[in-house]
């Protein structure tokens, strides 16, 4: 059984044996399974976005649990960029582990100030700006009871286009937050990645 993420193997009760190496082909046929490396070997180009966003939190990437990596990044973010606040709020769902790590490290309470509609997909891949903006409106809704009058820190995993961030900040202000601060758990995405 082969899968792109370890969590798929967990779900069916399979055991993770090893990762498929960059450029490797695993051939499974009537004679069994064999590995071939038909391409010139190059240095691996690990995509940091696997830890930040793409992988499911319950997967293992390069021997490390994605959830724990994201939570540790949030803790580091709190150490580097602390601000006095009343509440730490994740941008769901991908911002949750980093926000938990931020809250634990800072000692500021964690709460769900944004409720996510799980029937709306990834907003940053919509082909038009209007589509992205409309998707954000459908995907997230404020929880005014949690944020009204509070100084909040929003924690998200990344910013690709900024559409979600702008809308979420406005949403929190409209819900009555006294202050809205944004913390991002990864460096800015400024250029495309050509490594796949």
Language-model features: locations:
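PRPP-associated nucleotide enzymes
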Residues: 1-196
């Amino acid at each position: 059984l082969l899968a792109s993420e370890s969590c798929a193997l967990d779900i069916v009760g399979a055991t993770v044996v090893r990762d498929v190496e960059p450029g490797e082909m695993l051939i499974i046929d009537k004679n069994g399974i064999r590995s071939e490396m038909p391409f010139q070997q190059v240095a691996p180009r690990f995509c940091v976005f696997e830890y930040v966003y793409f992988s499911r939190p319950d997967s293992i990437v390069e021997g490390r649990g994605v959830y724990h990596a994201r939570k540790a990044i949030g803790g580091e973010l709190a150490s580097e960029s602390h601000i006095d606040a009343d509440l730490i709020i994740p941008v769901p769902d991908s911002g949750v582990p980093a926000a938990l790590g931020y809250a634990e490290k800072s000692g500021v309470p964690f709460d769900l100030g944004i409720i996510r509609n799980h029937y709306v997909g990834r907003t940053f891949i919509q082909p038009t700006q209007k589509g992205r903006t409309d998707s954000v409106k459908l995907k997230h809704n404020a929880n005014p009871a949690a944020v009204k009058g509070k100084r909040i820190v929003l924690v998200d995993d990344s910013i690709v286009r900024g559409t979600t961030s702008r809308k979420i900040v406005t949403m929190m202000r409209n819900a009555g937050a006294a202050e809205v601060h944004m913390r991002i758990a990864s460096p800015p995405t400024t250029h495309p990645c050509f490594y796949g």
